[in-house]
Amino acid sequence: MTDEKEYGSLGRLAPEWDGDGRERNLTADDIYERFFGWVEDVKGIEPWPHQEEAIMDLLAGDHVILNTPTGSGKSLVALGMHFAALCTGRRSYYTAPIKALVSEKFFDLVEVFGRDNVGMITGDSHINADAPIICCTAEILANQALREGTHADVGLVAMDEFHYYGDPERGWAWQVPLLTLPQTQFLLMSATLGNVDAIADKLSDLNDTPDVDVIADAPRPVPLSYEYTLDPMEKTVELAFRNGETPIYVVHFSQDAALETAQALASTGVSSKEQRQAIAEAIKGVKFTTAFGKILQRLLRTGVGIHHAGMLPRYRRLVEQLAQQGLLPVICGTDTLGVGINVPIHSVVLTALTKFDGTKMRRLRAREFHQIAGRAGRMGFDTEGLVIAEAPEYEIENQKAIAKAGGDPKKLKKVKRKKAPEGFVTWNQSTFDKLIDAEPETLVPHLKITHSMVLNEVAQGGDARARIDDLIDDSAQTPDQKEHLHQRADEIFQTLFDTEVIETEDCKDGGKDYYMTLDMPDDFALDQPLSPFLLAALELLDPESDTYALDVISMAEATLEDPKQVLRAQERQARDKAMADMKADGLDYDERMDKLQEITYPKPLEDMLEAAFDQYRHDVPWANDYWLSPKSVVRDMVETASDFTGYITRYNIARSEGTLLRYLSDAYRTLARTVPPEKRDEQLEDIISWLRVLVRSIDSSLVDEWENAGDSADQSEAAASLAAPGKKNAVVEDRRGLIVLIRNAMFRRVQLMDLDQPDKLGALDKDWGSGVHEWEDVLDDYYDEHEYVGIGAEARSPELFMLDDKHENDEHTWKVRQIIDDSDGDHDWAIEGIVDLDATQDTGEVVFHDYKVSN
């Protein structure tokens, strides 16, 4: 956070966006002097020559390709571009490949330019979307470029991580704006672009401004040294620690491997007593409430951090903050480090020079290597950074055996050298040296033509077919690829004509004017492109059905991106249960294996949804670009009365709790925003409120960051678009959602009573005096009196749940009572407790006092 004087300080140096009260359209010299005066006076930075050169080029109206090393100040150049745009009355955009980077940049720019001058669009977040500076994902800008073309109000664009231009799946979004926004000035930035001559030539040919300046000669601020080692990982890190070469980032290519290394290093003494004391003080007020959080807390206290995409955002940011304060000697993480994450590092240790790319194991490419290695070396702290590569495990074992022989020729002869495992993709010192010397590969352009791209062009008006043909012809693709793209465009246009989604009118000049026969959603082709299908599919459900609310959830879940780790865990558990059942039924091995392949995770309403989607794709052809994915995560949590922690435990997915949270947050937004109020019954309203409480209680970091980014009357509304809504001035933030959370927790215990599982009940309730032994006694007594525990609709009815809130305001507690629906209808047994409202809302789990189960 900046101080009060710095907040919005650069924004105050520019004319107001509406033009009132200050001068407009400053000269290039004025802008240059104001900006670099601010850089030196407010930020205390002396700019480098290449930064001054880049900003002078931008002020002259040229495009700039900034191909400079990590840490060379590309962000400052982008800042200068935004300032220049603000001073000349033009709207500017910052694009990045991932939402986390967009969000990070948004908050950074708010601090510098002020809240009113900066907006963010990521598909599921729209904040101040009419602002003069917009932060968005690359796909957002690409779709806007297709839909508005030369009419788009896009004056300048800073495209960060521009090496994504070469990404096979997403590269189209980096190429399309260059092809369709001739009026726009571009700043293309990356540390690993390689040869950019073809990109510069293409931009010069197509844009109204032909001048493209390539800045690629900036020296690396902190030089790098390289080592290849046959030492085990623990020894490598320990030596680096002793030599003062911290902070160390140990790079892995899987989340599980990162955690395993962290746990191994935690016991090797990679931090000093003073560091551990400083860390303990820094995390004193942090609540590590989840299963992985408790693991992280233990690791942090030893000086070891974890950083990967499967973590909760608040834990990831905590690790980054501790690293920025210089408190963490070691961080174990994945190669996501290479994508713009702001963590200061002295040494990078690569655990391998190979990775699994989704289809096969392969060696790192030069771009991937430099993207990671380039993070080493802290500007202003280090005279050089260190990059260490570990040898393969079998080579390390061989070296151990040789060292053990101690130079004795006889012993050396007896050493049995291990070989690489069969099929193992290996590497050696030569591999490492080649990567060090290699320039990043020349970016290979990618383009695709989809229904949504065509319809975005049609929405622009005029001759959409001619513009699509021009898009293909102007692209950087090969002749064969262009021919294939033209064929694909033919197919899509024909489909749209056949289904009467588009029609044409002849123009006087002999051309054609394309138009749509139906309205396309305003937020079409963003992050939830199947929302229109969800609205249509809701008509298939019977609102009077007992499962209506759950079925709406299943329809919504089918439109969401798969949380793969969660679904794999569901499938694994389903197969384990099926295997046990088949063994009990006496099926032979081959038959069990055959049947096992047919078992997967739950997919409610799969047949209905697939039939409906087939018809929808016929009626609405742009849906052919997407697919449904039926699944049951939210529904599963509701049916089993699970809270976040309980669900994590049930499927053993503590390492992927961040993935689950993101999914629940997406589900909350979809249900809250897409399902109309008239399609919600009481149960669905309860579930939406419960999700809202759950998401915010687990991780409110996005909301908190927004609330800290200056004062504004609309902050709560904006916060709601980032995550579940923020706090209100009341003991209970969301009464309805909290009641559902508590009722679910109580009913989960009823379900476990029905299953006669005192071990699980004891695990839930041991902290308030009802451990396994107490629950064993309770269940024995209960089943002496009654035959079974009811878990049907009557058992879950409001009549069997009681809430007394008379001490809500003075003691911040509720008294709750869940009556058991016993086999005899006596209703003489109940679970009772005093709920700690503050702790419950902080953790997303019900925290009790005075808890008991009795008759």
Model regions: which residues?
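Non-catalytic terminal extensions of ATP-dependent helicases
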Residues: 305, 324-325, 408-411, 415-759, ...
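A short beta-strand element within the Helicase C-terminal
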Residues: 154-157, 330-355, 384-390
